[in-house]
Swiss-Prot record:
Reactions it catalyzes: N-(5-phospho-beta-D-ribosyl)anthranilate = 1-(2-carboxyphenylamino)-1-deoxy-D-ribulose 5-phosphate
Similarity field: Belongs to the TrpF family.
A Gene Ontology biological process term: L-tryptophan biosynthetic process
InterPro entries in alphabetical order: Aldolase_TIM, PRAI_dom, RibuloseP-bd_barrel, TrpF_fam
Entries under Pfam families matching the protein: PRAI (PF00697)
EC number: 5.3.1.24
Alphabetically ordered keywords of this record: Amino-acid biosynthesis, Aromatic amino acid biosynthesis, Isomerase, Tryptophan biosynthesis
Organism annotation: Clostridium acetobutylicum (strain ATCC 824 / DSM 792 / JCM 1419 / IAM 19013 / LMG 5710 / NBRC 13948 / NRRL B-527 / VKM B-1787 / 2291 / W)
Pathway: Amino-acid biosynthesis; L-tryptophan biosynthesis; L-tryptophan from chorismate: step 3/5
One of the record's GO molecular function terms: phosphoribosylanthranilate isomerase activity
Protein's name in the database: N-(5'-phosphoribosyl)anthranilate isomerase
UniProt keyword Isomerase present: yes
Length: 205
């Protein structure tokens, strides 16, 4: 079954919603973003999260010691790197589960995937400025053509919503799908959209 991550959790109301519908993962964004939370806020929210839901911390080119501090404080299950982090940086996170986000714009982007020693790749859209949470999708067919070269679980992100997530799964059959802006209304997580998104994903066995 395709797993689900709801990213950009930042309010107690968001925690109540995800506790009700139980995605597999939630994401706390520690990088500069309109969904950013600090370590202390994330810790309070995480304490109220259902124990069955895994916690992912999203970082962009953050100091490695800060990543470790936040991870221990919030009790993160996974570190998601959404910047220009290289192999040397990732090697310093030995002992942590790491997802590396990559923007797919050409075949060469896919080629470099296999050089990273991580647990999964999160493939996201790119709007030319922002890293993730942009509502922009990527070329699923380009990724599909190169999937056999990656040899790691793929998490599909970027512009997913209740209208296109089924097609994404049909094309890619990813390990997981990651949604943020696609389940928001006026910049806030929308319970009905989260419910429908999760229902549509979970119909795939």
């Amino acid at each position: 079954m395709v797993k689900i991550k709801v990213c950009g959790i930042r309010r107690e109301e968001d925690i109540e919603i995800v506790n009700k519908y139980k995605p597999n993962y939630v994401g706390f964004v520690f990088a500069k973003s309109k969904r950013q939370v600090d370590m202390y806020k994330a810790e309070k929210l995480a304490d109220k999260l259902d124990v069955s839901i895994k916690k992912v911390g999203v970082f962009v080119n953050e100091d490695i010691e800060k990543v470790k501090e936040v991870s221990f404080r919030v009790k993160l299950d996974i570190v998601q790197l959404h910047g220009d982090e290289n192999e040397e940086y990732i090697d310093k996170l030995k002992g942590f589960k790491v997802w590396k986000a990559v923007n797919v714009t050409a075949g060469k982007d896919v080629e470099k995937f296999k050089n990273y020693r991580i647990d999964a790749f999160l493939v996201d859209g790119y709007d030319g400025t922002n890293r993730g949470g942009t509502g922009k999708s990527f070329n699923w067919n380009l990724l599909k053509e190169n999937q056999d070269k990656i040899l790691k679980p793929i998490i599909a992100a970027g512009g997913l919503n209740i209208d296109n997530v089924e097609k994404c799964i049909e094309v890619l059959n990813p390990f997981a799908v990651d949604v943020s802006s696609g389940v928001e209304t006026d910049g806030f997580k929308d319970e009905e959209k989260i419910k429908k998104f999760i229902m549509r994903v979970r119909k795939f066995k």
